[in-house]
């Protein structure tokens, strides 16, 4: 079997604000735990609204690109109140749109209901976050994305991507060598991120994209989508 190390985060009460120094340092400890974790299980009480403290913790998860599972606890009580999984999922998406890709588990911790599913989800996102993609495959996907929806001109200049490569895992980190990073609009980068999430085994984990200017002849040479098929990089 597999072993897991659980890092609890005592000292943070899910109130609308941090009431005192003890709770403040509890929040700091929780943020440090998020940085250490391979996977975060972010718990919400099905009987309460999402609090300011919840939002602060999720901000830390987003900032650190830590894989996470959103966990709605006390689900037995929610069922009794005729709450549905779809309604709670929509509530989470509306509140944390930046984590709309993260899986959601509905559990009752007191009885262990759906605990196995929660563990399986944690294992799944851990596996996804550790995947490595060959440079050839990555470049073919980016090339197709640029063909389908070219980045628009900005300041009368054409954004160009020369090649893409994955440089790290936990989180999956992809470097795009380009002419000028500032030419790529936020909306186009979101589009590319969506394509990568759809085409690669990173559907439920954060993907970190780094735009880097190519050193030297930044404005010269063919862009990725201008290369013929035979010139596509195939190495890992």
Predicted regions, residues:
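C-terminal-of-GTPase-core extension/linker across diverse P-loop GTPases
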Residues: 1-7, 11, 15-28, 32, ...
